[in-house]
């Protein structure tokens, strides 16, 4: 009798697993209430391994989405998947990596985001007209959610082939590299760059209550554009090493 019950439980488990694995993604996702502003169209594949031809968030096209759920994570009470998105995105934002939801909330590991700098700068409230060239890449080694920003996170942000253009001239920045960390929603970002035109370093911090502090300096190098040199007279005097410092703090 016990053996029959055991076989029955085993058969039921295998059957349920097979149903879940082969359940069409369209059938599984259609009844679910998606967050307001999120739209998924062209859903294909299974709940386990599928894709959406188009993802839209608040009216913005994010391109396609592919996912591959991890069975091992489900056994630990977590919903985890490898995802890739961005092909066909109107903003050219692309991303890939591991995302999941556990008992402690959302998380991500080894996640990479890529976006043209020309697109990113349009989202910033700049006091003067600027254009940017190059590619932004954010590599998130690990992220653990915690109100309001993150319980823990670390990674890097790189801006390759960086260039800023203004009505009075362009500045070649080369590669701007920075590292970021987060502990208890205290976010810090530190980095710098150097080219034949200019060198700089910066250090930013953001508190959970949205207070921020920024410290930075830049130094004109030998090939600093002549059209921009004229504007240096409007700045405070540089220090003994020829660096122009900036310090700012406030509330976002």
Swiss-Prot record:
Periplasmic side: 26-252
Location in or out of the cell: Cell inner membrane
Pfam families on file: T2SSN
Topology, Cytoplasmic side: 1-4
GO-annotated cellular components: plasma membrane; type II protein secretion system complex
Endpoints of the signal sequence: none
GO-annotated biological processes: protein secretion by the type II secretion system
Record-annotated membrane-spanning stretches: 5-25
Naturally occurring in which organism (per UniProt): Vibrio cholerae serotype O1 (strain ATCC 39315 / El Tor Inaba N16961)
Major localisation: membrane
Taxonomic classification: Bacteria, Pseudomonadati, Pseudomonadota, Gammaproteobacteria, Vibrionales
Protein keywords: Cell inner membrane, Cell membrane, Membrane, Protein transport, Transmembrane, Transmembrane helix, Transport
Family: Belongs to the GSP N family.
Gene from which the chain derives: epsN
Described purpose of this protein according to its UniProt entry: Involved in a type II secretion system (T2SS, formerly general secretion pathway, GSP) for the export of proteins. Required for secretion of cholera toxin through the outer membrane.
InterPro entries: T2SS_GspN_CS (IPR000645), T2SS_protein-GspN (IPR022792)
Protein name per its UniProtKB record: Type II secretion system protein N
């Amino acid at each position: 009798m016990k053996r029959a019950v055991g076989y029955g439980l085993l058969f039921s488990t295998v059957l349920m697993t097979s149903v879940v694995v082969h359940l069409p993604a369209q059938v599984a996702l259609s009844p679910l209430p998606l967050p307001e502003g999120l739209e998924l169209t062209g859903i294909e594949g299974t709940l386990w391994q599928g894709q959406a031809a188009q993802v839209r968030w608040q009216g913005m096209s994010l391109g396609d989405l592919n996912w591959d759920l991890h069975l091992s994570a489900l056994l630990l009470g977590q919903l985890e998947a490898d995802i890739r998105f961005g092909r066909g995105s109107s903003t050219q934002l692309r991303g890939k990596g591991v995302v999941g939801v556990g008992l402690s909330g959302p998380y991500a590991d080894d996640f990479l985001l890529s976006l043209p700098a020309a697109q990113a700068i349009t989202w910033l409230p700049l006091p003067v007209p600027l254009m940017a060239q190059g590619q932004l890449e954010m590599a998130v080694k690990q992220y653990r959610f915690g109100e309001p920003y993150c319980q823990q996170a670390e990674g890097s942000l790189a801006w390759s082939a960086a260039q800023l253009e203004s009505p009075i001239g362009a500045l070649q920045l080369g590669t701007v590299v920075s590292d970021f960390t987060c502990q208890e929603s205290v976010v810090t970002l530190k980095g710098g760059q150097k080219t034949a035109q200019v060198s700089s370093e910066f250090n930013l911090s953001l508190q959970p209550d949205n207070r921020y502090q920024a410290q930075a300096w830049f130094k004109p190098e030998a090939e600093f554009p002549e059209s921009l040199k004229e504007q240096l007279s409007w700045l405070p005097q540089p220090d003994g090493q020829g660096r122009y410092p900036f310090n700012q703090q406030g509330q976002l």
